[in-house]
UniProtKB/Swiss-Prot annotation:
Source species: Klebsiella phage K64-1 (Bacteriophage K64-1)
Keywords assigned: Degradation of host capsule during virus entry, Degradation of host cell envelope components during virus entry, Host-virus interaction, Viral attachment to host adhesion receptor, Viral attachment to host cell, Virion, Virus entry into host cell
Lineage: superkingdom: Viruses
Name of protein: Depolymerase, capsule K64-specific
Major site of localization recorded for this protein: virion
Purpose: Functions as a receptor binding protein (RBP) and probably mediates the attachment to the host capsular exopolysaccharides. Displays a depolymerase activity that specifically degrades the K64-type polysaccharides of Klebsiella pneumoniae capsule.
Lineage, top ranks: Viruses, Duplodnaviria, Heunggongvirae, Uroviricota, Caudoviricetes
Length: 996
């Protein structure tokens, strides 16, 4: 039967058994047979002769289109089989034995049906009914054919093959295996017995040479049909081969093979046999054929130092790779288009350097008329030093993509005097998909770095995992996945059970699930590596990195990144973020779980979000945060160090080193700008939560304090004031001449801090040591209060010179002396309160610099609440009058629950002087009791709109009777107030002075 008989368009081929007649069968060829059993038990097969396709609707052919020549037509029934039996026609396997004997060229009656338990001799041949194969051997037959029996292949009869000779040809190879051959040259039979030709295998050598165009024709017989038969080898290799198996639109049959699998090569998948070479061969074949690999199950044991290179799509999801203990190899994924390196003497680099390269440029102007690098990712190195990394000076570098004639995707952070190397990586025209296998480290392989991606672009990498990894990796490659020279990459869904604690030479070293170098536009999505270990990600010389929905214990950058670093919707562990940057960092909707009990309080650096201390602790860019959550507390660290961790930390291991070389354009900020929009701390803390919100350890003077720090909508959930410690920061570049700031009004602001809609008990600002006090701080608190178990006002302490402004806040206390160190400000500052409330248990102000006279607290449109009194002179009454300069304020007494004018002095005058200190510009109201009896006349004073002191004070008064105004003299230490008003002389005695 020809294979074409199986075509769906052929109705005269082999019958296909589709079982019992039933509803819902889809008929697309008349070869499909359905069997119907009538009420008498007769089983009849029916073939559909109507229009195709057809779907049955009932269980009976008579009601599903009917039985006719144009509908259902019967072909064979049980009665017909019984008739054949009566005629002596046997339809069992035995009936086929003579035919099979002829086909296999076996002796007549030597072939029998395989029957378990039967003894076999060398002259016996057995037909196995299970699959129709023929076997021969000596022994007892089992339930299925097996050793020592061997399968016998049939012998075909005659095949003809032709070819056209070339000039001088005397040899040709017939593309078949055969036993007998007849050779014809130009139609003449050649005589083998007289030396006309010699046969060696499938090669025929002629006795003499042919001329070009001579006709070669052979007739061969007794061709064995093997597992890989001649149709696959020859017929299906022809351009029209696919048509021979019914694929009318196909070409070469090889085109139909669009992937390779391990199963195709019968590779052991139990993990018990070393299959290193077999897998490597499949990788090589896939690279050669440029087709993907797909395998979704099995465990495969590998060993040795083999590097498995693959440059096509590769889907090994579900596969487990089991490296042996001596395994030092790795899977290397790379693209066909490899990079080109242009050195300083190349014409391309010379062309780039022909134009000036400036900071903020997004065009290499030297390439404005050159297309060499179009559509390439480039990695450039320059002549100028940028920074020092662990004692090594690193020169200028930049990663970007050239779209067309020098146009870069990324602007240059810094300019450079000249380029000395360009590595150009062609960007792939297609997206390559990689699905990683699982790696089982149960054997503790000698190398952990089992996955590497080198020189790749537009790769989408999925899945994969590492498990049974020891917590302590001793003297091993500490990186699982390494990515080098890459552009436009997404790595997602990789699962590492936990990061390890690495030990090298007995000391803690680094260990990472993922490491990358020289990359641009790489995204890590849904990666898991969370636990007690060292780290998850270590990167250097990288540009534009994104972490999305990752559950990892640390994000770590070694060399500073450029462009952006985005951490979005992630869950980070105890180590948080450690990064040096020459770009901006964005952290959004991310949690930090800082519980440290398992680590016994050990931290590499103090902060949750840190700069790299081994690179000098600088970060020449901003950090922008939105909606982050701090979970738990570093309680062991707090116990050992008697302080909490910091939120932001810029710290250098060695303050004596110069981490920024002379002439470098890098500015050593400890974060240039910090903007936090949304911070929530879930665990209540007794005391202050952070040692400092922004911190530089010790007095290092290596990095600048951020120019701008802003906290919006933050809840610190602690019971003591939070702190910003200014110790240890380098002298601000805005006062590089070290001008002594004696008065905040006499110098521009150098640094800006702002809190809006924040909840904390209070805030403390600790100034640098006096010899480094060159900052002029501008700090604003807007709508801040403490929202804990109840709403309460906040306290503010500072010894740092600055302009401090509080708008719509609830304030308890303001002091120019720090709470934690009792350090008094040594410079003049200013304090302004706009709106809001001042609600104090005791006095609200303690301004001690220069006795407070030169540092007024300007209070506008504010409500004062507290133990204010109009009937007695209280300390809070006097404190507000002395330190605050008031405008449109009101006083509410929580003693009698009413608005009042606080009393500053009550009583009667005497010859003794009474001293009252009132801030210049405050309004006071003096009440005078009339001592002269004049009918219809009472005496009152107007508000005295200036400060009160012992001595003469000018003012005015009026009498109710006439409204006449006159001048008077007031002596607060005199007995009477006297004045001449027209013709009436009035006398009065001061009985009270009140703050308005």
């Amino acid at each position: 039967m020809s294979l074409s008989n199986l075509s769906s368009s052929n109705s005269n081929g082999a019958f296909l058994d589709y079982g019992e007649f039933r509803s819902g069968v889809y008929i697309q060829t008349s070869n499909q047979i359905l069997y119907f059993t009538d009420e008498n038990g007769n089983k009849v097969g029916y073939q559909w002769k109507g229009l195709l396709p057809h779907t049955t609707t009932t269980n009976d052919p008579s009601t599903d289109g009917g039985i006719s020549d144009t509908a259902w037509c019967s072909i064979v029934g049980s009665g017909f089989i019984e008739k054949l039996s009566k005629e002596g026609i046997d339809l069992s396997w035995k009936a086929h034995l003579p035919t099979v004997e002829v086909s296999y060229n076996l002796p007549h009656k030597s072939l029998k049906i395989w029957e378990e338990g039967t003894n076999s001799t060398d002259n016996d041949y057995w037909l196995y009914p299970g699959d129709g194969t023929v076997w021969n051997g000596i022994g007892v037959l089992g339930d299925i054919p097996d050793a020592p029996f061997k399968q016998i292949v049939p012998q075909n009869n005659v095949i003809e093959w032709s070819a056209i000779a070339t000039e001088g040809q005397n040899q040709f190879t017939v593309p078949y295996e055969f036993t007998n051959i007849s050779v014809f040259i130009n139609g003449l039979l050649q005589n083998k017995s007289t030396g006309g030709y010699v046969v060696n295998g499938s090669t025929v050598t002629l006795n003499g040479s042919l001329k070009a165009g001579d006709d070669i024709h052979v007739v061969i017989s007794n061709i064995p049909i093997k597992n890989i038969n001649y149709i696959t080898d020859v017929e299906l290799s022809q351009p029209d081969a696919a048509q021979k198996i019914g694929l009318l639109h196909g070409g070469n049959i090889q085109n139909l093979q669009n992937f390779l699998s391990f199963d195709m090569f019968n590779i052991d998948k139990t993990g018990s046999t070393d299959v290193t070479s077999q897998i490597n061969n499949i990788f090589s074949l896939a690279n050669q054929l440029n087709i993907p690999i797909k395998q979704h199950d099995g465990t495969y044991l590998v060993s040795g130092s083999t590097i498995f290179t693959i440059n096509t799509d590769c889907d090994l999801s579900g596969v487990t790779i089991l490296p042996s203990s001596n395994f030092t190899g790795y899977f290397l994924y790379t693209q066909n288009e490899q990079p080109t390196t242009y050195n300083s003497s190349s014409s391309l680099v010379t062309l780039i350097n022909s134009a000036t390269i400036n900071a903020n440029d997004s065009i290499l102007y030297g390439l404005i008329n050159d297309t060499t690098l179009d559509g390439n990712a480039i990695f450039m190195k320059g002549n100028d030093p940028l920074y020092v990394a662990r004692g090594t000076t690193k020169n200028w570098w930049c990663n970007t993509r050239i779209s067309n004639r020098g146009k870069m995707d990324d602007y240059l952070k810094y300019g450079v005097s000249g380029i000395n190397e360009v590595i150009s990586l062609p960007i792939s025209k297609k997206v390559t998909t990689i699905k990683l296998p699982n790696w089982d480290f149960i054997n503790q392989p000698a190398n952990n770095g089992v996955i590497r991606f080198n020189n790749i672009s537009r790769y989408r990498i999925h899945g994969g995992s590492v498990f049974n990894r020891p917590l302590n990796d001793i003297n091993k490659d500490p990186v699982i996945i390494s990515i080098n020279y890459a552009y436009d990459i997404i790595l997602q869904d990789f699962y590492d059970e936990y990061p390890s604690w690495p030990l090298v030479g007995g000391s803690i070293a680094y260990a990472y699930t993922i490491n990358f170098n020289y990359i641009n536009r790489v995204t890590f999505k849904d990666i898991n590596s969370q636990g007690y270990g060292w780290g998850i990600v270590g990167g250097q010389l990288a540009t534009n990195i994104t972490y999305l929905r990752c559950n990892i214990n640390r994000v770590d950058m070694h060399d500073p990144f450029m462009g952006y670093l985005k951490i979005l919707d992630c869950d980070l562990g105890y180590y948080g973020v450690s990064a040096t940057g020459m770009g901006d960092m964005y952290i959004e909707r991310t949690t930090f779980n800082i519980d440290d009990l398992a680590f016994n309080g050990w931290r590499e650096v103090d902060g949750i979000i840190n700069t790299r201390p081994d690179f000098g602790g600088w970060f020449d860019g901003g950090v922008y945060i939105k909606d982050i959550t701090i979970i738990g507390d570093a309680s062991k660290f707090r116990e050992i160090n008697n302080r909490g961790v910091s939120l932001f930390s810029a710290y250098s291991y060695n303050a004596t080193l110069s981490y920024i070389p002379n002439g470098s354009p890098v500015e050593p900020w400890g974060f240039k700008e910090i903007i936090v929009n949304g911070l929530r701390c879930t665990k209540p803390i007794t005391g202050k939560r952070f040692s400092s919100l922004v911190y530089a350890a010790s007095v290092q003077n290596v990095d600048y304090f951020p120019r701008h720090v802003k906290f919006n909508n933050c809840d610190f959930n602690s019971s003591d004031v939070e702190c910003i410690d200014l110790h240890g920061w380098k002298i601000t570049p805005d006062n590089s001449s070290k001008t002594s700031i004696s008065n905040t009004m006499n110098f521009k602001s150098t640094n800006f801090i702002e809190f809006t809609d924040c909840s904390f008990v209070g805030l403390e600002i600790l100034r640098p040591y006096s010899s480094y006090d060159y900052m002029n701080l501008e700090l604003k608190l807007n709508n801040c209060k403490y929202i804990g178990s109840n709403i309460s006002p906040i306290s503010f302490y500072t010894d740092q010179v600055g302009n401090y402004e509080f708008t719509n806040c609830d304030i308890n206390f303001i002091s120019d002396t720090t709470k934690s160190t009792s350090s008094l400000s040594n410079r003049q500052s200013s304090f302004v309160i706009n709106g809001g409330q001042i609600n104090s248990v005791s006095v609200p102000f303690s301004i001690l610099y220069n006795s407070g006279y030169s540092t007024p607290v300007l209070v506008n449109n504010t409500i004062f609440k507290g133990s204010f009194s109009q009937s007695s002179v209280t300390s809070i009454n006097l404190n507000v009058a002395e330190f605050a300069q008031l405008s449109n304020c009101r006083f509410y007494s929580n003693v009698n629950n009413s608005y009042i004018s606080p009393a500053l002095w009550l009583g009667s005058t005497s010859n003794s002087a009474t001293s009252i200190t009132v801030m210049r510009g405050n309004k006071i109201n003096t009440v005078i009791t009339n001592t002269t009896t004049v009918s219809g006349i009472s005496i009152k004073t107007d508000i005295i709109p200036f400060g009160v002191a012992s001595g003469h004070i000018n003012g005015s008064f009026y009498v109710d009777a006439t409204g006449t105004t006159g001048t008077y003299q007031l002596y607060l230490n005199s007995l009477n107030l006297k004045s001449q008003i027209g013709k009436i002389v009035s006398n009065g005695t001061i009985s009270g002075i009140y703050l308005q």
